[in-house]
Amino acid sequence: MKEYQVYLERSRSRQQDFLYPLLFREYIYGLAYSHHFHRSIFLENVGYDNKYSLLIVKRLITRMYQQNHLIISANDSPKNPFWGYNKNLDCQIISEGFAIVVEIPFFRQLSSSFEEAEILKSFKNLRSIHSIFPFLEDKFTYLNYVSDIRIPYPIHLEILVQILRYWVKDAPFFHLLRLFLYHFCNWNSFISTKKWISTFSKSNPRLFLFLHNFYVCEYEYILVFLRNKSSHLGFKSFSIFFERIFFYGKREHLGKVFAKDFSYPLTFFKDPNIHYVRYQGKCILASKNAPFLMNKWKHYFIHLWQCFFDVWSQPRMININPLSEHSFQLLGYFSNVRLNRSVVRSQMLQNTFLIEIVIKKLDIIVPIIPLIRSLAKAKFCNVLGEPISKPVWADSSDFDIIDRFLRICRNLSHYYNGSSKKKSLYRIKYILRLSCIKTLACKHKSTVRAFLKRSGSEELLQEFFTEEEEIISLIFPRDSSTLQRLHRNRIWYLDILFSNDLVHDE
C-alpha cells in the first residue's frame, strides 16, 4: 500500500511555482491573451473582451503592496480600506488576471495528457454537448441498471485550498486565493451555498469555473489513478468532454477507494460493462450486471467523498433503478430504454411457432413540464403554458422583438432536435410564437387579430416553423424521402458548446 502512496505523490510531484513572479510582469498578460492562451478551456467567450486594461491590473496589484494590507483575518470588516474606493471592481479586475495566470500551467498539463492519450484529434468533436447522446444510444441499450449520482456538496473552502496544495507549492498563491474567497464569502461557509455561487459565478466566472473544475477533476483523477496502478487491463475507451464546466468520460474497471492515507487494503473487481458519464454536478453510472455490483459502486463513491474530501454524501443521493423502468434526466432530456416487443410467426414443417422478439431502444424525450416552468419564469407564458405578452420588450422595434423570439426559438429547436418525439418541441415553439405576436400587439395597443390583419406579420412569423425545414432542404432535395425521414428522426449537432438557460431551470 505504500507503493500506491508513493505513486500518487510522484504523479503529483509536478507542482507549479508560478504565481507572484508572473503577476508583476505585464507581458504575462499579453501571453495569456495570445494565440495559445487567449481562450480559456474552462470558459470561452465570457464577454469581457477589452473591458479590463492589463495596465490597470498591474497598477492595482502595485497599490495592494503599497497599502500593505495583505494580512486579513476572519474578523475583519468587509469595509476594508485595502480595497480602496471601489473594492468590488478592483477585486474583480485582479481576480480576472489571477485566473488567467493560474489556468496557464493547468492548460499545458491538460494538453500534454491529451497528447499522451492520443485523443487530441477528437477533442473538438467531444466539446459538443450532443456528443454524449450518440454514446448513450450506442451503449445504454445493452445495459440493465442505471444509477443517478449527484456529486455531493457542500465542500468547505479550506478543503478546496488543501486540494490545490497537492499541485501548487507557491505559498503566496494560497494567500491571494484566500483573499479572493474571503472577499466574496464567509470563510467559514461552504463553496456550494446557492447565494455564494450566484454572487461569485457572476462577478468572477473564470475563477469560479476553474475552482469548480479542479474540485471535480481531483475526485475523478483519483479514481483513474487507482485503476491504472492496480489493474493489468488497459483502457479500451477513455475520453474527456471539456466545455466550460461540463465533462464527458467513459471509464472501465474502476476500483474500490479507501481513505486518503491508503492504510487499508485496496481490493478491485473487474467490470468491463460499467459506463460513467458526468455532466456538471450529476453522474450517470450504468451497468449490465446485477444490482449487487451497482450497490458496490455506490459504496465506493460514498467512501471516496467522505474519506478523501470530508464531504458527507447521503446514500439517497445515489439511486439504482432498472434502466427499462426508470427515466434519468441528463442535459435537459429525459432518457430511458424502451422495450419494443413484436411477435414473429415461424413455421417448420407442420409445426407453427410464435416467437416474441424484444428490441431495446433509447428514448430521449423533451421534458415539457420543466420547459413550460422555465418559460413561465421568463414571463413567456403562465404556469399552465398559456402564452402571454412580454411588456419589458415593448420599447424595442418590431424587428428586434421578432429577432429576440426567433433566437430563443432557434436555440431550443437546435438543442432539442434529437428528441424521439417532436410534439413537445412544437408546443414550445407555438408558445414562443404566440407570445411574440401578443408582445407586438401590446406594443401597438391592439388585439392580436387586428394587429395581424393590419400589419401582415403572419408570414414573417412563419419563420418559427419553417427555418428548420429550410436548413435541412439545403442538404437534401425537398422531394427526397430522406428529408421526410429526417423530420421524424433525431438530429444531433456537434457544434453546440453550451445550452440555453431555459434548459436548466431548477
Curated annotation (Swiss-Prot):
UniProt entry tagged with the keyword tRNA processing: yes
One GO BP: mRNA processing
Annotated localization: Plastid, Chloroplast
Record key words, sorted: Chloroplast, mRNA processing, Plastid, RNA-binding, tRNA processing
GO CC annotations, alphabetized: chloroplast
Pfam families found in the cross-reference section: Intron_maturas2, MatK_N
InterPro entries membership: Domain_X (IPR024937), Maturase_MatK (IPR002866), Maturase_MatK_N (IPR024942)
GO molecular function, one term: RNA binding
Record carries keyword Translocase: no
Protein family membership: Belongs to the intron maturase 2 family. MatK subfamily.
Protein function: Usually encoded in the trnK tRNA gene intron. Probably assists in splicing its own and other chloroplast group II introns.
Name recorded for this polypeptide: Maturase K
Organism encoding this protein: Pisum sativum (Garden pea)
Gene this protein is translated from: matK
